[in-house]
UniProtKB/Swiss-Prot annotation:
This is Bifunctional purine biosynthesis protein PurH. It holds the Pfam family AICARFT_IMPCHas. HAMAP family: PurH (MF_00139). Keywords: Hydrolase, Multifunctional enzyme, Purine biosynthesis, Transferase. It catalyses: (6R)-10-formyltetrahydrofolate + 5-amino-1-(5-phospho-beta-D-ribosyl)imidazole-4-carboxamide = 5-formamido-1-(5-phospho-D-ribosyl)imidazole-4-carboxamide + (6S)-5,6,7,8-tetrahydrofolate; IMP + H2O = 5-formamido-1-(5-phospho-D-ribosyl)imidazole-4-carboxamide. PANTHER family: BIFUNCTIONAL PURINE BIOSYNTHESIS PROTEIN ATIC, BIFUNCTIONAL PURINE BIOSYNTHESIS PROTEIN PURH. It comes from Bradyrhizobium diazoefficiens (strain JCM 10833 / BCRC 13528 / IAM 13628 / NBRC 14792 / USDA 110). One of its GO terms (molecular function) is IMP cyclohydrolase activity. Residues 2-150 form the MGS-like domain.
Length: 530
């Protein structure tokens, strides 16, 4: 590939986001570039004292239909699409009075922002850009001759090339800008089509598109031999993608994945009702607790599995305070994420330069609709987010003994947590804290036994005479297919169980519970997580 420089003699600018526009236009004018523009962009350039030609002067045709038709004209698209070295194209341009356009600067109508503001259907429709994407695609197709800019962040790259190449752009830059241009129009169309699907309540459209904006190129993926990048999607759900990083090292792929898991889990706990803390390792909670304040919630969560918590991710549902910050800095932690933090807490965390502190502003709404996606070989699995919430469920008592008030409180707590642990999941909980977590086992019995062993290890570390599972309650993310899994929980000391129910052998499981005098409730809601 040669540099193939193309001198910029004429630029068409039409932008909704006018950030940096005037400085850019002035720099183009300094390179003797003729400025052509539309509507508000032309007015802004003219108001800055620059000479600018309205696009209607170029086309000989006025803007019409409330601005819906202004650049959809052969003299615009011919100027963008004409191959400069093609004699037939050159002859056609001369015959029809078409002037070449060497640089196109367009950012699109703010459709995504309009949707985010909760605008009505007609307002959203009016913010669907037609002429902009058409011009962008035309210019990008003809990138051998035309440079196309879709974001203000690329103004500098264009100006640097004009300065270095006597007013010309290189093919290398034009190709990079063309690739970005097509990605932008694809993401824009994805946002529109997904919005339409939501309006029409279409869950499985014939074609599904997803768009994202690069947040960060990552050093590597899950493992050092894998490449990775992090993209923001249009829904702006509070979490790691929207949070401000106040300090610490650059987030890694695994940091982002784990932080997302932690913050989604903490979103289950209403900050107005209780303080809560979640500690995550490898995308699984290893300690979760509620408390009268954050520091007590953190201590209870840490006590569940302090070994796994080393190098973990900590999520809080309230603003991080100084007392909690001091406790956290006593062990190695990768990331802290919270809605906010006090100045004193920020200063305390600041003494640990590598510790990443993220402030998300608010908590994710566990009831909010949305989609999750997972790639498979040659395909994409898409499903609605698991937005079933404990507070909306009916806990049906199916045993002779009903749970006590304290047991029911802990059962609801444990089932909140079970939703966010990899299946098969068994959670032992007591006094609004996890005391044993069994995650990701192929056998539910194994999950029950592993969680009980972890609780026993924690009791030894805390120098307790009895296992933490004694007098605890149990949550299972899915039904017990046989009584053996529940019996393992009873053997560990559990006194009450919450599970979805729905097994062919529910009667057998209920009978075993009654024989051992424990209480059991069904939710009717399963929380598989893979």
């Amino acid at each position: 590939m040669t540099d193939h420089p193309r001198r910029v003699t004429r630029a068409l600018l039409s932008v909704s986001d006018k950030t940096g526009l005037i400085e850019f236009a002035k720099a183009l004018a300094a390179h003797d570039v003729e400025l052509v523009s539309t509507g508000g962009t032309a007015k802004a350039i003219a108001a800055a004292g620059l000479k600018v030609k309205d696009v209607s002067e170029l086309t000989g045709f006025p803007e019409m239909m409330d601005g819906r038709v202004k650049t959809l004209h052969p003299k615009v698209h011919g100027g963008l699409l004409a191959i400069r070295d093609n004699k037939d194209h050159a002859d056609a341009m001369k015959a029809h009075g078409i002037a070449p356009i060497d640089l196109l600067v367009v950012n699109l109508y703010p459709f995504e922002a309009t949707v985010d503001k909760g605008a009505g259907f007609e307002d959203c429709i009016e913010n669907i850009d037609i002429g902009g994407p058409a011009m962008i695609r035309a210019a990008a197709k003809n990138h051998d001759d035309v440079a196309v800019v879709v974001e203000a962040e690329d103004y500098k790259a264009v100006l640097d090339e004009l300065a270095a190449n006597k007013g010309a752009t290189t093919l290398k830059l034009r190709r990079r800008l063309a690739a970005k241009a097509y990605a932008r129009t694809a993401a824009y169309d994805a946002a529109i089509s997904n919005w339409f699907n939501r309006q029409l309540e279409i869950d499985a459209p014939d074609f599904r598109a997803f768009g994202g904006k690069l947040i960060q190129s990552l050093r590597y993926g899950e493992n050092p031999h894998q490449t990775a990048a992090f993209y923001a999607t249009p829904d702006k759900r509070p979490g790691v993608s929207t949070a401000r990083q106040l300090q610490g090292k650059e987030l890694s792929y695994n940091n982002i994945n784990d932080t997302d898991a932690a913050y989604e889990c903490i979103g289950e706990f209403d900050a107005k009702r209780t303080a809560a803390c979640v500690i995550v390792k490898h995308a699984n909670p290893c300690g979760v607790a509620e408390g009268s304040d954050l520091v007590s919630a953190y201590r209870k969560a840490l006590a569940c599995d302090s070994t796994s918590a080393f190098g973990g991710i900590i999520a809080m549902n309230r603003a991080l305070d100084a007392d909690t910050a001091r406790e956290i800095t006593k062990i190695f932690t990768e990331v802290i994420i919270a809605p906010d933090a006090s100045e004193e807490a920020i200063a305390i965390i600041g003494a640990r330069k590598n510790l990443r502190l993220l402030l998300a502003g608010s908590l994710p709404d566990p009831r909010a609709p949305g989609l999750t996606a997972k790639t498979v070989a040659g395909g994409l699995l898409v499903q609605s987010r698991d937005n079933a919430v404990v507070d909306d469920m009916t806990f049906k008592v199916v045993t002779k003994r009903a749970p006590t008030d304290a047991e029911m409180r802990d059962l609801k707590f444990a089932f909140r947590v079970a939703k966010h642990v990899k299946s098969n999941t068994i959670i032992y909980a007591k006094d609004l804290a996890t005391v044993g977590i069994g995650a990701g086992q192929m056998s539910r019995v194994d999950s029950a036994r592993i969680a009980a062993r972890k609780a026993q290890d924690a009791a030894v570390e805390l120098k307790l005479a009895e296992p933490l599972t004694k007098g605890s309650v149990v949550a299972s993310d899915a039904f017990f297919p046989f009584a053996d899994g529940m019996l393992a929980c009873i053997e560990a000391g559990a006194t009450a169980v919450v599970q979805p129910g729905g097994s062919m052998r529910d009667d057998e499981v209920i009978k075993a519970a009654d024989e051992h005098g424990i209480a059991m409730v069904f939710t009717g809601t399963r929380h598989f997580r893979h």
